[in-house]
Amino acid sequence: VPSGRALAHPRKGKIGKVLFPHRGTIWGVMGAVVFLFAHPQALLFWPGVSCILGGELLRLWASGYIKTYRGPMEEVEELVTSGPYAYLRNPLYLANGIIGCGVVLLSGILWALPLFLGSFVLLYGSIIRAEEAFLEEKFGAAYREYAASVPRFVPRLLPYPKRKGTFAPKVLWEKESTTLLTLGLVVLLFYLRGFGVLRVLDRLLGL
């Protein structure tokens, strides 16, 4: 975003505001469909696990700086520019994308990867526009300067100099423990789907 240039007008982020509270449900439904038709392969399974672990580590780093990241946008009280936010503006969404790619690898359905990436861009593109409009309205010039200096997804080499925000470990237990348990269960289910008792689904589904 060029320095001094206004970001999206709040009215242009209406779709994103509608999708924002339902993003977890949307990914859950898509994941369930992929699981049913999955054909896990050992060659792809463990790289998929590695992607999920890497994405979750980034989530843990990022979520520790955002005290209300699971709440509505209106609960945001400060513009956080420390930690991973000093390098890119959307580390949580990047982490979700990495995790999503990992789940596709677990499934063994490589043709689902471009479908996932397309859905990711459509969903988070709308959400990010809504968030940017809200943050610009709330924090004004401070956010415009930050957005002009820090990319959305491609990390900058050096951290943003005007860093603000602290890491709160307690947030990880309060907000991220469910994600950790869910991802562990996802890996287990896909393992059983491909190499254990849940292979019976192939016969039930006629695959």
Predicted feature locations:
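Glycine-rich acyl-CoA binding loop
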Residues: G83-A86, N90-L94
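Membrane-anchoring alpha-helices and their flanking helix-loop junctions
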Residues: V1-S82, G97-L207
